[in-house]
Amino acid sequence: VCNGSNVTAINFGTANTGGTTTYSWTNDNTTIGLGASGSGNIAVFAAVNTGTSPVTATITVTPTFTNLGVSCTGPSKTFTITVNPTPTVNAVSDQLLCNGDATTAVTFGGAVAGTTYLWTNNTPSIGLLASGTGDIASFTAVNTGTVPVSATITVTPRFTNGSVGCNGTPTTFTITVNPTAQVNTVSNQVVCNGSNVTAINFGTVNTGGTTTYSWTNNNTTIGLGASGAGNIAVFAAVNTGTSPVTATITVTPTFTNGGVPCTGPAKTFTITVNPTAEVNAVSNQVICNGTNTTAIAFGTGNTGGTTTYSWVNNTPSIGLGASGTGNIAAFTAINTGTSPVTATITVTPTFTNGGVPCTGPTTSFTITVNPSAQVNAVSNQVVCNGGNTTAVTFSSTATGGTVVYNWTNNTPSIGLLASGTGDIAGFTAVNTGTSPVTATITVTAQYANGSIACNGTPRTFTITVNPTAQVNTVSNQVVCNGANTTAVTFATGNTGGTTTYSWINNTPSIGLGASGTGNIAAFTAINTGTSPVTATITVTPTFTN
């Protein structure tokens, strides 16, 4: 029997006659709901088995035959009462999934081994049969509608033993299938650059949950982000190109119910932004005072109409008018100052099509005119052969850039290189000749600004190196005491200046002073002694230029 069901009344019988037969019985397992012993028949009772496997009680019945006051006990007989347990089924988790998803396989279990499970499904449209036995394999969930569909699965556990099937308490769980998310069709838009795109509010036919929307934009240059969620607010359309730009917006709906999001098929629409008239960028120019600018031919990427150009110049002193139309021809740049002058040229394009002029944004470029760098005056130098020159430090009045000084020397024999850059350090002057040597140094200031170098007007100065003064050899004289010497006239090979002479006499007793300048006139020689007297005259020449 099953736990909780009634055991049929047991009425003992016998073949004995001619007396009275009574019965006594014992029960070895009182857990089934029957006492341990009794006499007479066994009445109906409710079978009990609170365990998880069948319980069997053995009933031993002993007959006693009585006649004329004598009781005779006969052999006992046994029989069994088996009580099957009540099967159970473990709770099954509900499932919530999207149309087209695979369900999780359901494996039933319970406390009683050998239990089978019978189930019914009240909504076969989800893709599951109306009924079945055993576990439920994974299947593809189906919901072709617009609202969630929930199927209730009722599971009944059954334990069978001794050809007796015992059902347990049914349990239920649900499988809810969310619909495929949908988004309503969105109209395409065509707008102008700089104008507002109309707000886009997405809609759906789905109900019974929440539908959200995510979108992507394949062309962010129109002023809309690459992606977003929810509706698209009004935004200013952008097209910085020269032809219409079309962005394709792909919107994907997601339907959420019970915390499960289900993504539906995407839909697309377009936003087309027409361009604005434009002028191509113009390169800046940096040039030198007095040179020609590069002619400027304006251009545009716009097509399908005519683009004209008007321009204004904020610094006409560079040699260009204050305003004009069309291209700008080459002109001679002017800067009479000492620092760069920059003119800003602002160009406005006008695109005309069908008789309608459309003015686009302006663009600006600059023309910078570097000044002509001038070298400040440098003093000439006159030095002696072997003497040190004064270091020459160049300078200029030019500002706003870098000034470099390049110089050449037409007479490297003076001890200075034929050319160089920068200041000239002091050096030892050289002149191995007999006349002054003059070197002309030509220095050119080079002014650099904006990677453009501009040479100024060269300036010159001189370094004159006087020769080493010389005096020609003078013949020795031997004279008698009291006689006149021969006058001595000094001479030199030097030219190009004036050579003077100073002399000293180491023996004034001969009648000649101890020192003097210029030539030595004849004089009366004196020697009051008894032996010859020799005087040494040392002459020093000085060359002046």
Q: Predicted segment positions?
A:
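Extracellular low-complexity Ser/Thr/Asn/Gly-rich intrinsically disordered segments
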Residues: V1-N545
